[in-house]
C-alpha cells in the first residue's frame, strides 16, 4: 500500500496485522482520486473510518489543506499517526480516537470531502450517511465518497444531496454524493 502521487508519492504505508482493518486496494484508490482530483486542492477532508489513514493521506499528498482522521480503535489511530509521520504530512492532520457517531454528534467543523470506508459487515455506512446528511458538516458542493461491497444498497435520495452513478471496481462500488449548492459539476 503506497501513496500514489503528490508530495508523498511512492511512500509505502504501514498496514495492520489481522483483518479488523481492510485497506482500499491501490487500483480502487487511484480510480477514486481520479474522479475527485479537481476537488482536492485546498480542501478540508474528513476520513471518518480512518483505518490506515490512506485516503486522507492521499488527499493531503495531492494538496488538501487539512485532514481529520477518526477511528474508534487505538491501534488504528496509532497506525494513522505512524503513516502520517512516514509521509511527513502530520502538520496538516489531526487523529481523533472516537466512535463515528459520537464524533459526528459533537462535530462543529465543516469539510469539503468526507471519506466513508467502514467495515463492510456493519451498518456503519448507512448510519454515518444518515447522520452526515442531517447535520451541517459538509460545505455546499462538498463530496461524500462511500466505499461498499457489491450488493450492499444505499439510498439514492438524501435531502440536499445529489447522488451520482456508482463506480464498480471488482467486488467494490464507490458511490459519490455531492451536497447541493456550490459547484454542481457531475461526479
List the predicted regions and their residue ranges:
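Class I S-adenosyl-L-methionine-dependent methyltransferase catalytic core
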Residues: 1-187
Amino acid at each position: 500500500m503506497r501513496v500514489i502521487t503528490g508530495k508523498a508519492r511512492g511512500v509505502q504505508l504501514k498496514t495492520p496485522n489481522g483483518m479488523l482493518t481492510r485497506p482500499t486496494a491501490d487500483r480502487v484508490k487511484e480510480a477514486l482520486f481520479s474522479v475527485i482530483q479537481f476537488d482536492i486542492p485546498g480542501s478540508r477532508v474528513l476520513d471518518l473510518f480512518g483505518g490506515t489513514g490512506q485516503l486522507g493521506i492521499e488527499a493531503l499528498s495531492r494538496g488538501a489543506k487539512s485532514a481529520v482522521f477518526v477511528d474508534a480503535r487505538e491501534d488504528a489511530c496509532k497506525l494513522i499517526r505512524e503513516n502520517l509521520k512516514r509521509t511527513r504530512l502530520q502538520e496538516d492532520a489531526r487523529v481523533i480516537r472516537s466512535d463515528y457517531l459520537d464524533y459526528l454528534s459533537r462535530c462543529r467543523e465543516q469539510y469539503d470531502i468526507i471519506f466513508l470506508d467502514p467495515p463492510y459487515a456493519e451498518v456503519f455506512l448507512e448510519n454515518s450517511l444518515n447522520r452526515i446528511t442531517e447535520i451541517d458538516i459538509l460545505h455546499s458542493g462538498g463530496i461524500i465518497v462511500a466505499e461498499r461491497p457489491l450488493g450492499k444498497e444505499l439510498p439514492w435520495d438524501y435531502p440536499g444531496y445529489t447522488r451520482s452513478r456508482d463506480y464498480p471496481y471488482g467486488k467494490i462500488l464507490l458511490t459519490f454524493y455531492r451536497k447541493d449548492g456550490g459547484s454542481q459539476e457531475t461526479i
